[in-house]
């Protein structure tokens, strides 16, 4: 993420105003769970109203196979094929017809599809271990859709080498499990992917995961669906050097367990909808990143201006589930909006500016749910004034160490909300539907204890000691203060992670267009 210039633009605006700134386990998974998705030509649902990319087709939901389907029994460098539509050629399995193929056994080579544009290929993984040292394990470069079913009780493994051999002018496949078009994964079995060259799972259209226990270890991205990613009823564990789950479109998580033990950015998409599930993210960069797209031909100035814009169609929305983020940069970073409408969200952001726990270009509102974020004061933001659920913005004069519990108790000593921060912090945003206007609460963090009588909207304890934009507080003055107190003195210049002052550029003025790129 391009952070420094983004933050420096905010500093320049501040100087012009001359006032306070206002907010600008490594063990592979074998647990099985039961898939319960209704086949009704409508969206599978665990709640009364959820957001999804589209309808699930019968093919997406089909986990069935029979004795009449083609069987492919793999045996290291050979295969025994019973049925039509598949051949063993040049050390690989080639599938040439639409249909269902049941695969089992160990294999050194590649599964290739060469089917028609409208064909659907159903691959049933019934205990496979496929390794290809010179390319991807699965190369579905043709067909309308590939559906992979993980048979209950089986463990299936895909792995590749550290380099791929390509024909002249080619650069695909570029993932251990590569699908040129649409990909659906369903079933209750396990899938382990050891990705040593590029991404682990990649679909260049829509990617749907409706079940399974998936473990990914990748030197690059873990899961990429170019147009969209939808996840339900799956258990996914990720260790990735690059992004955990990413798409150039919409990411929707309706249920399941997602454990991103390591990634650059945890979840990344144009729009992110989290409607349920348990999501744990440890990221070296942003935890949750809702961002737009630029054409590759855009200039640096256009890209910088684009990053500063409120991208109206870009958002992060959480309506349910439990989300826990430990981020090396921004915990939440939205180039547009942030909507917290339910669920439980815990965010631990960076320990030094300009990265913060909550970062947005448009607005951030909370209307329901539980939310706690901790981070630094520099460039910090809190919720916008049009939030309908009460919240507290807390400033601390010195950093509190990692492992410090921040909690809110009512006048009877009952804990309303608590969170143990993964990193040191000097700033926190706390919200709960149990924070009642007119009631007095105690906010405790380490040796710090403050009482606050809740007013509708935003409430503040402590004073800011860092430069940069504060949050959009309530209009009655109870909201988070912006940057330094308005003493007439200019705010501190933004610094890099080492505390060095950053050079001030001229603010960009160019506009840019939002278009897809591969």
Q: Model-found features: residue ranges?
A:
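Positively charged n-region of N-terminal signal peptides that target proteins for export
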Residues: 1-7
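A composition-driven surface/loop motif
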Residues: 7-518
């Amino acid at each position: 993420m391009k952070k420094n210039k983004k933050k420096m633009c905010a500093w320049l605006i501040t100087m012009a105003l001359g006032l306070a700134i206002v907010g600008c386990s490594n063990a592979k998974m074998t647990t099985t769970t039961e898939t319960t998705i209704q086949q009704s030509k409508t969206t599978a649902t665990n709640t009364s109203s959820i957001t999804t990319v589209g309808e699930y087709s019968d093919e997406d939901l089909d986990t069935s196979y029979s004795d009449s389907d083609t069987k492919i029994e793999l045996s290291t460098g050979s295969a025994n094929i019973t049925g039509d539509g598949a051949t063993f050629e040049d050390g690989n399995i080639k599938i040439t017809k639409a249909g269902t193929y049941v695969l089992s056994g160990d294999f050194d080579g590649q599964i290739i599809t060469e089917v028609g544009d409208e064909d659907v290929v159903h691959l049933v993984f019934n205990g496979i271990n496929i390794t290809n040292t010179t390319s991807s394990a699965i190369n579905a470069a043709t067909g309308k859709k590939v559906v992979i079913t993980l048979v209950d009780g089986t463990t299936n493994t895909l792995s590749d080498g550290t380099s791929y051999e390509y024909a002249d002018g080619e650069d695909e496949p570029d993932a251990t499990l590569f699908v040129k078009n649409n990909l659906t994964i369903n079933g209750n079995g396990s899938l382990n992917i050891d990705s040593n060259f590029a991404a682990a799972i990649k679909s260049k259209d829509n990617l749907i995961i409706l079940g399974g226990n998936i473990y990914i270890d990748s030197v690059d991205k873990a899961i990429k669906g170019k147009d969209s990613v939808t996840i339900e009823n799956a258990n996914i564990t990720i260790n990735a050097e690059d992004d955990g789950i990413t798409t150039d479109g919409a990411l929707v998580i309706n249920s399941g367990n997602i454990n991103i033990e390591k990634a650059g950015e945890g979840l990344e998409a144009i729009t992110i909808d989290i409607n349920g599930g348990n999501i744990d993210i440890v990221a070296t960069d942003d935890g949750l990143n809702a961002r737009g797209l630029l054409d590759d031909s855009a200039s640096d100035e256009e890209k910088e201006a684009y990053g500063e814009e409120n991208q109206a169609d870009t958002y992060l929305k959480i309506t349910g589930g439990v989300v826990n983020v430990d981020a090396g940069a921004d915990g939440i970073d939205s180039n547009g909006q942030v909507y917290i409408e339910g669920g439980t969200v815990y965010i631990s952001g960076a320990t030094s500016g300009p990265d913060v726990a909550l970062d947005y270009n448009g607005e951030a509102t909370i209307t329901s749910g539980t939310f706690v974020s901790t981070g630094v004061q520099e460039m910090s933001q809190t919720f916008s004034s049009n939030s309908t659920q009460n919240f507290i913005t807390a400033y601390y004069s010195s950093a509190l160490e990692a492992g410090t519990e921040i909690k809110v108790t009512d006048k009877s000593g009952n804990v309303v909300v608590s969170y143990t921060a993964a990193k040191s912090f000097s700033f926190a945003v706390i919200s709960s539907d149990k924070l009642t206007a007119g009631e007095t609460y105690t906010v405790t963090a380490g040796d710090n204890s403050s009482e606050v009588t809740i007013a509708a909207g935003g409430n503040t304890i402590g004073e800011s000691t860092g430069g940069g934009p504060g949050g959009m507080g309530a209009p009655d003055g109870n909201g988070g203060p912006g940057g330094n107190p308005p003493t007439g003195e200019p705010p501190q210049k933004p610094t890099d992670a080492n505390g060095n002052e950053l050079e001030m550029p001229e603010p960009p003025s160019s506009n840019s267009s939002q278009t897809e790129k591969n």
